C-alpha cells in the first residue's frame, strides 16, 4: 500500500469514527431532553408563568390580514394565563387589522393597539410590551404561524433559572419556492 492510500484510509476511518461519536452524543442529548420535557409536563397550573404574545404589524394586505393561526389554540396546550397584543404600526390601510379586531372582539385575551403613525417595528413592540404584564413575553412577527404547543414548550424551558431567553425553531413557509429559500 502506498502512503497516499494509507493516509486516505486513515482519514476516512477517522471521519467515520468522529461522525458516529457526534451522532451518539446527539442521540444521548435528545433522550435526556425528552426525559426532562416529560417531567416538566407535570407542572401545576397555578405555578405556570403568565405569557404575553406581542405581534407587531404594518401595512398588512386586507386579502392577507395579520396571521394569528396557532395563537387561539395555545390555551389548549398551555393552561396558564395568556394574552395577545397586536400593535399596528400606523398602517395606511387598517382594514386588515380591523378585520382581525372584529374576529377576536369577544376574546378578552386579545388587545389591539393602533399607533397613530409609523414608528418602526421595535417601537411598535415596545408600545405593546409597555402595556403587557406577563411573566414571559413572546415576540412574534405578523406573518408567523405558531405550532399549537409553542407557548407551553418555551415556558417550560424558561423554568430553568440558568436560562435567560429561549427561541423556537423557525421554518420558512416558502422554503421550497426558490433556490434562495431552500
UniProtKB/Swiss-Prot annotation:
Protein keywords: Cell membrane, Glycosyltransferase, Membrane, Nodulation, Plasmid, Transferase
For this UniProt entry, the molecular function terms from Gene Ontology, in alphabetical order, are: hyaluronan synthase activity
Which top-level group of life is the source organism from? Bacteria
The entry's localization annotation reads:
Cell membrane
Q: Which InterPro entries match?
A: Glyco_trans_2-like (IPR001173), Nucleotide-diphossugar_trans (IPR029044)
Using the UniProt record, name the top-level EC class of this enzyme in a single word: transferase
Q: Gene3D superfamilies, from UniProt?
A: Spore Coat Polysaccharide Biosynthesis Protein SpsA, Chain A
Task: Look up the record and give one Gene Ontology term from the biological process aspect.
Answer: hyaluronan biosynthetic process
Enzyme Commission number(s) from the entry: 2.4.1.-
Q: How does it sit in the membrane?
A: Peripheral membrane protein
Q: Name one matching Pfam family.
A: Glycos_transf_2
Q: Which GO terms describe its cellular component?
A: plasma membrane
Q: Which family does it belong to?
A: Belongs to the NodC/HAS family.
PANTHER family in the cross-refs: HYALURONAN SYNTHASE, MANNURONAN SYNTHASE
**Function as written in the Swiss-Prot or TrEMBL entry:** Involved in the synthesis of Nod factor, a sulfated N-acyl-beta-1,4-tetrasaccharide of N-acetylglucosamine which initiates a series of events in the host plant species leading eventually to nodulation.
Report the protein name in the record. N-acetylglucosaminyltransferase
Amino acid at each position: 500500500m502506498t502512503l497516499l492510500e494509507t493516509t486516505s484510509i486513515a482519514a476516512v476511518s477517522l471521519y467515520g469514527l468522529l461522525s458516529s461519536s457526534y451522532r451518539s452524543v446527539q442521540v444521548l442529548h435528545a433522550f435526556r431532553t425528552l426525559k426532562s420535557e416529560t417531567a416538566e409536563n407535570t407542572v401545576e397550573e397555578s405555578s405556570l408563568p403568565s405569557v404575553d404574545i406581542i405581534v407587531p404589524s404594518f401595512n398588512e394586505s386586507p386579502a392577507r390580514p395579520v396571521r394569528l393561526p396557532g395563537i387561539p389554540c395555545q390555551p389548549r396546550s398551555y393552561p396558564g394565563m395568556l394574552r395577545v397584543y397586536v400593535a399596528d404600526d400606523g398602517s395606511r390601510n387598517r382594514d386588515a387589522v380591523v378585520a382581525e379586531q372584529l374576529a377576536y372582539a369577544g376574546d378578552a385575551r386579545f388587545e389591539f393597539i393602533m399607533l397613530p403613525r409609523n414608528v418602526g417595528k421595535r417601537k411598535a413592540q415596545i408600545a405593546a410590551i409597555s402595556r403587557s404584564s406577563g411573566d414571559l413575553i413572546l415576540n412574534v412577527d405578523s406573518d408567523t404561524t405558531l405550532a399549537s404547543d409553542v407557548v407551553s414548550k418555551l415556558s417550560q424551558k424558561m423554568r430553568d433559572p440558568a436560562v435567560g431567553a429561549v427561541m423556537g425553531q423557525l421554518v420558512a413557509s416558502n422554503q421550497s419556492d426558490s433556490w434562495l429559500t431552500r
